[in-house]
Amino acid sequence: MEVTALRRSAALVARASSQNAIRPAVCAAISSTSPTPPTQIQTQQTRQFSALNRPPPNYPGHVPLTRLERFGLFVGSGLISLADPLRGDLIASFAEATATPYFIYRLRDAMLSHPTGRRILRQRPRITSQSLNIPYLRSLPPNTVGRTYIDWLDREGVSPDTRSAVRYIDDEECAYVMQRYRECHDFYHALTGLPIVREGEVALKAFEFANTLLPMTGFSVFAAFTMKKSEQKRFRKIYFPWAVKNGLRAKEVINVFWEEELERDVNDLRRELGVEPPPDLREIRKREREEKRRRKEMERMLSGRGTEDVIQKAEKEAEVVAERVKEMRNEVVEKVGEVVGSSAMRG
């Protein structure tokens, strides 16, 4: 009897021990299927929301954008720059918003496929007033690239230091390609002779689009519809055909190492690149203003006030002529008197 009781007690103890060992595992299994604590839910939500935020910058000054932010930058800067093509800051933002994902890579590949372009990408030079040595450019002969460039800067009242830094292109090398294009823009102006007036900027943007295929340059051409009718007509007949022809025919201007061409004859460089300067836009605009001024004067003269002015002017001229005739008559009378007197003395 005692042995049997001991065996039963041992069995009960073993059963209790096994149940105690199973209970933590069951509790752990139950706890794994229980609702997530509030703090853990908040952490997951924060992690999901952070995916919508900007990633870390890839280079100094870089501002990464989400797709929504890039779209907003595209719409806002595009509409305002279309109305005012001289807003360089908005045009720069619009260029960066539309250059990716394809077009800036195509321009980068064009540089990589050219020996000079590859050197530019390796050295990454910047075009500023310090790097170009402005006083030296002014000492160059008039027909050189450097002198043509600095004369254009002085005539238009601009500086190479006004180009803003690229911020919205994610790839660092492509960001430099955009920066290089931006800083070379004034060299394109000097090479073609186009001024920074709206008409000249739109014409140069059309040239750049045909040569670089950057979307911003193509969209900028639509700013021609905001110009005056006379300017639109001139752009349609002269400068747009010139831009398309020369932009497609010319070599990739992004591959020009301008810093090494400063002492070269500008016409030789134009021939090498295949760029033919357009008609002088400033001279055309000057002649147009003079023609308008003469036309207004003619209209004023043909009006009532103008007729009165003409009559008064004619009367004054008639008085002057009459006075002169009177003086001439007196002179003739005096001469005749002298002749008669001398004849009488001889007689």
Swiss-Prot record:
Lyase that catalyzes the C1-decarboxylation of 4-hydroxy-3-methoxy-5-(all-trans-polyprenyl)benzoic acid into 2-methoxy-6-(all-trans-polyprenyl)phenol during ubiquinone biosynthesis. Component of a multi-subunit COQ enzyme complex, composed of at least coq-3, coq-4, coq-5, coq-6, coq-7 and coq-9. GO terms for cellular component: extrinsic component of mitochondrial inner membrane; mitochondrion. It is found in: Mitochondrion inner membrane. Zn(2+) binds at residues 185-186, 189, 201. Pathway: Cofactor biosynthesis; ubiquinone biosynthesis. GO terms for biological process: ubiquinone biosynthetic process. Its EC number is 4.1.1.130. Residues 284-310 are annotated as: Disordered. Transmembrane segments: none annotated. It is an enzyme of class 4 (lyase). This is Ubiquinone biosynthesis protein coq-4, mitochondrial. Keywords: Lyase, Membrane, Metal-binding, Mitochondrion, Mitochondrion inner membrane, Transit peptide, Ubiquinone biosynthesis, Zinc. It is a peripheral membrane protein.
